[in-house]
């Protein structure tokens, strides 16, 4: 249960902290774009011209516009600002950043 969050939380937190523009694909195929303002166990607050509350169960993929370092394995001052989250069926993908960058 907590194992899934050990990847999701640092990834979303790095995107939020570095204000990386993201594309969020929903399970119905809709693409949302903006910056992650905040998140919790169930929702992501996405800011563009307006703020949108996006439920995580509706998200298929989160694609950053540029690579982001979300692991503190190389100890470059990894922060421990973990949110308390339960498990989610979200399918985040950090390796698709070159999908639409042409």
Swiss-Prot record:
Residues 63-102 are annotated as: Disordered. SUPFAM superfamilies: Sm-like ribonucleoproteins. Homohexamer. Residues 9-68 form the Sm domain. It comes from Shigella boydii serotype 18 (strain CDC 3083-94 / BS512). The lineage of its organism: Bacteria, Pseudomonadati, Pseudomonadota, Gammaproteobacteria, Enterobacterales. InterPro entries: Hfq, LSM_dom_sf, Sm. GO terms for cellular component: cytosol. One of its GO terms (molecular function) is RNA binding. GO terms for biological process: regulation of DNA-templated transcription; regulation of RNA stability; regulation of translation, ncRNA-mediated. This is RNA-binding protein Hfq. Belongs to the Hfq family. Residues 70-96 have a biased composition (Polar residues). RNA chaperone that binds small regulatory RNA (sRNAs) and mRNAs to facilitate mRNA translational regulation in response to envelope stress, environmental stress and changes in metabolite concentrations. Also binds with high specificity to tRNAs. The keyword Nucleotide-binding does not apply. Transmembrane segments: none annotated. Keywords: RNA-binding, Stress response.
């Amino acid at each position: 249960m907590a194992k899934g969050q050990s990847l999701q939380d640092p990834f979303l937190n790095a995107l939020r902290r570095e204000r990386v523009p993201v594309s969020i694909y929903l399970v119905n195929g809709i693409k949302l774009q903006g910056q992650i303002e905040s998140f919790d166990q169930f929702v992501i607050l996405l800011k563009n011209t307006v703020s949108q509350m996006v439920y995580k169960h509706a998200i298929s993929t989160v694609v950053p516009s540029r690579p982001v370092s979300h692991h503190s394995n190389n100890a470059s001052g990894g922060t421990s600002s973990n949110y308390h989250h339960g498990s989610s069926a979200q399918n985040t993908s950090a390796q698709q950043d070159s999908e639409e960058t042409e």
